[in-house]
A protein has these predicted regions:
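Conserved AAA+ ATPase core "coupling" helix
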Residues: 8-17, 119-152, 159-163
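The conserved phosphate-sensing helix
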Residues: 158, 168-183
Length: 183
């Protein structure tokens, strides 16, 4: 019943962990900015609470961010910090005080994919995961993918094209891109 979200570390528009908007330099809602109140912005790990978070190409993720993700997985919460947060300030709304004091919930199932070598992923993060490895596609499988892609693209090609493309890659996506670029 939970949410399923997809995130790619190469996409910088959606923060994974979340952030705190500095009321002076980054701006905040008018009612918060005038009082100098920092505004926590929950990220995708909080949005995925109770559901699934899929991280595509986790191997491209900065190692520091991998460690932050590890902390979230361990605590099942995201903690927010800001030099502008003053727990004694009576003007801070209760919901913001609660986010700073208790954090935001982030209990989710993490599914991640990578084409990188397992050794390139944080060992601590890997130790908390069930790993599934897929064998590289065979040249015959690549050729079959090319024939299927050619049908979908309505491309007529010479009989040997699938075999030629299969000599250059073991990835289905790259193979279909080669076909699309050629035709």
């Amino acid at each position: 019943d939970g949410t399923t979200l997809r995130w790619d570390p190469r996409d910088i528009t959606n923060p994974l962990i979340g952030s705190v908007h500095d009321p002076i330099y980054q701006g905040a809602r008018r009612d918060l900015a005038e009082g100098g109140v920092p505004e926590p912005k929950p990220g995708l790990v909080t949005e995925a609470h109770g559901g699934i978070l899929f991280i595509d190409e986790i191997g491209e993720m900065d190692p520091m961010l991998q460690n932050k993700l590890l902390k979230v997985l361990e605590d099942k919460r995201v903690r927010f910090e800001s030099a502008y947060y003053d727990p004694t300030d009576a003007h801070i709304p209760d919901y913001i005080r609660q986010l700073f004091d208790q954090g935001a919930p982030a209990d989710f199932v993490l599914i991640a994919a990578t084409t990188r070598s397992p050794e390139e992923i944080s060992p601590a993060l890997r130790s908390r995961a069930a790993e599934i490895f897929f064998e590289p596609l065979t040249p015959e499988q690549i050729a079959e993918i090319i024939r299927g892609a050619a049908k979908k693209l309505r491309v007529e090609m010479e009989e040997r094209v699938p075999e030629i493309i299969s000599e250059y890659t073991i990835e289905g996506r790259k193979a279909t891109n080669l076909l699309a670029d050629a035709y």
